[in-house]
């Protein structure tokens, strides 16, 4: 029984890592999942909204 729980827990953590869940996302379940990346939580995150706004501005 203990081994089964350990295996399931390990598989759960592996799936979270596979799908790119961060510790910040798990720690804050109230956060809006459709919001852009939090620059404070991940300084290397790509700011897609900023890139889209700049492309729209450049292309007219």
Curated annotation (Swiss-Prot):
GO terms for molecular function: toxin activity. GO terms for cellular component: extracellular region; membrane; other organism cell membrane. Antimicrobial and mast cell degranulating peptide. Has broad spectrum antibacterial activity against both Gram-positive and Gram-negative bacteria (S.aureus MIC=32-64 ug/ml, S.xylosus MIC=3 ug/ml, S.alactolyticus MIC=16 ug/ml, C.koseri MIC=4 ug/ml, E.coli MIC=8 ug/ml, K.pneumoniae MIC=64 ug/ml, P.aerugiosa MIC=256 ug/ml, S.choleraesuis MIC=32 ug/ml, S.typhimurium MIC=32 ug/ml, V.parahamelytics MIC=32 ug/ml). Affects membrane permeability of E.coli. Shows hemolytic activities on sheep, chicken and human erythrocytes. This is Mastoparan-V. Keywords: Amidation, Antibiotic, Antimicrobial, G-protein coupled receptor impairing toxin, Immunity, Innate immunity, Mast cell degranulation, Membrane, Repeat, Secreted, Signal, Target cell membrane, Target membrane, Toxin. Residues 1-27 form the signal peptide. It is found in: Secreted; Target cell membrane. One of its GO terms (biological process) is defense response to bacterium. Its main location: secreted. Residues 28-45 form a propeptide.
């Amino acid at each position: 029984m203990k081994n089964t729980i350990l295996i399931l827990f390990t598989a759960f953590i592996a799936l979270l890592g596979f799908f790119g869940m961060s510790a910040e996302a798990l720690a804050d379940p109230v956060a809006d999942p459709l919001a852009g990346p939090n620059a404070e939580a991940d300084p290397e995150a790509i700011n897609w909204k900023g890139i889209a706004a700049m492309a729209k501005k450049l292309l007219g």
